Amino acid sequence: MDYFTLFGLPARYQIDTQALSLRFQDLQRQYHPDKFANGTQAQQLAAVQQSATINQAWQTLRHPLTRAEYLLSLHGFDLASEQHTVRDTAFLMEQLTLREELDDIDQSKDDVRLESFIKRVQKMFDARLQQMVEQLDNAAWDAAADTVRKLRFLDKLRSSAEQLEEKLLDF
């Protein structure tokens, strides 16, 4: 059973996150291992396994990138373990330039510049995310997979910038 079916949701990117949360809570209560403490060893093991599956499904579907990766995996794209990378040289050059800029900001400890950088990267991420949503909605799986690969780069860059922000705030 796929994760969408487990949560009673259609297998598509745009989901009702409130319904996801409510169903997660219901499933947690229903399959919590403590409810099977007096059961047989097989029942206890099954409850632990089911609970682990529910938690993994929840973690996967609640985050935009992992939800997209999972949806793509249902259509034959195993992005989690693939060796493919982005082949768009202009995008890769842009990423190198942004990384260098972030390094410069780190060296200068310029929090104002960092704030502007974070906003710019977030806008880039949001634009790619919208592009990916449209591609997934239109079943453009190859294009969506490529966009997810690019979103990974931007997500890591955003995370690095946010870590630098925490570092500068503690400084």
UniProtKB/Swiss-Prot annotation:
Pfam families: HSCB_C. GO terms for cellular component: iron-sulfur cluster transfer complex. Signal peptide: none annotated. Keywords: Chaperone. One of its GO terms (biological process) is [2Fe-2S] cluster assembly. InterPro entries: DnaJ_domain, HscB, HscB_C_sf, HscB_oligo_C, J_dom_sf. Residues 2-74 form the J domain. The keyword Glycoprotein does not apply. The keyword Chaperone applies. GO terms for molecular function: ATPase activator activity; protein-folding chaperone binding. It comes from the Bacteria. PROSITE patterns: DNAJ_2. Interacts with HscA and stimulates its ATPase activity. Interacts with IscU. Co-chaperone involved in the maturation of iron-sulfur cluster-containing proteins. Seems to help targeting proteins to be folded toward HscA. NCBIfam families: hscB, PRK05014.1. Belongs to the HscB family. This is Co-chaperone protein HscB. It comes from Salmonella agona (strain SL483). The gene is hscB.
